[in-house]
């Protein structure tokens, strides 16, 4: 099944002592057609160092995702940002979470489920009719 992963799934998959590592790794490994938004690659660049990951390891992870034969990268475009911002306004959402809504909107527009460990985002997506995977 095609699925778009939120950044937190990639973070937990990467960090072996993270609370959801096993679940994230299993989800990533079992996905037949996994997708990531390029914004998630950017977010990994500033999230992973917060967990003590050194710069070289972060660079290697970014390179791995950019050149992956496993993940399909959905490249963030101006058009996607315009549509996501309209989606935020129309649904009275907060731009404080614009990064999350860009990724969620990407899944919504492609009609693929979003996989996220963010319970608040998960619940809001369900209310808005965005498919989410129960993790």
Language model segments and positions:
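Residue-level detector of anion-binding/catalytic polar loops
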Residues: 33, 113, 131
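Short, well-structured N-terminal submotif of metal-dependent ribonuclease cores
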Residues: 1-36, 51-60, 127-128
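A generic structural signal for short hydrophobic patches within well-formed alpha-helices
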Residues: 10-11, 41, 121-122
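A general structural signal for well-ordered alpha-helical segments in protein cores
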Residues: 21-24, 41, 62, 81, ...
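Active-site-proximal, substrate-binding regions of enzyme catalytic domains
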Residues: 43-89
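Aromatic- and histidine-enriched alpha-helix N-cap/loop-to-helix transition segments
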Residues: 36-39, 102
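Histidine- and aromatic-rich ligand-binding microenvironments
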Residues: 5-6, 36-37, 93-97, 118, ...
């Amino acid at each position: 099944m095609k699925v778009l992963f939120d950044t937190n799934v990639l973070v937990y998959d990467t960090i072996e002592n993270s609370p959801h590592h096993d679940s994230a790794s299993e989800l990533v490994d079992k996905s037949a057609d996994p997708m990531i938004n390029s914004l998630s690659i950017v977010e990994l660049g500033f999230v992973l160092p917060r967990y003590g990951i050194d710069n070289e390891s972060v660079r290697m992870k970014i390179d791995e995702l950019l050149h992956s034969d496993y993940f399909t990268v959905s490249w963030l475009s101006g058009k996607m940002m315009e549509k996501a911002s309209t989606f935020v306004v129309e649904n009275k959402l907060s731009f404080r979470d614009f990064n999350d809504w860009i990724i969620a909107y990407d899944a919504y527009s492609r009609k693929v489920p979003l996989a996220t460990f963010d319970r608040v985002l998960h619940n809001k997506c369900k209310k808005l009719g965005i498919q989410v995977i129960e993790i």
